[in-house]
Amino acid sequence: MTLRVLTVDDSRTILAMLHHTLSNAGFEVLQAEDGRQGLDLLKAESVDVVITDINMPVMDGIEFIKNVRATGQHNSLPILILTTETSQDKRDQGKAAGGTGWIVKPFDPEKLISVIQRVVH
């Protein structure tokens, strides 16, 4: 079974890097450029894991996670936060919102794949 990954980031460069990394690992990749687009995709598509940035326009990653969890439909969906943020306060906010894991940019492709495989199995 091919894992489906939703990536949410306002940087097209990061989205392209994620697409390349994840596609080469055999994952199907869906992309959104902000939290609002991410929510719309989650309403229309089934995914196995989400990777989201925190600092984005329209709807940031923390609000995105809160909204995903608030629906009650995706309580067990792994949501990984991929960000340049390193503060403990932001980590606490991400965890409190319902984030599953935290990865700091720039990311190691092998580590990212390993974390995805761990959280979905």
Where are these regions (language model features)?
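C-terminal output helix
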Residues: 107-116
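Short hydrophobic/Thr-rich beta-strand motif most characteristic of the beta2 strand and flanking loop
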Residues: 26-33, 41
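A Lys-centered signature of the CheY-like receiver
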Residues: 67, 105
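Active-site beta3 strand of CheY-like receiver
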Residues: 45-51
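Charged docking surfaces used in two-component/phosphorelay signaling
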Residues: 16-24
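Receiver (REC) domain active-site loop signature in two-component systems and cognate sites
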Residues: 56-59
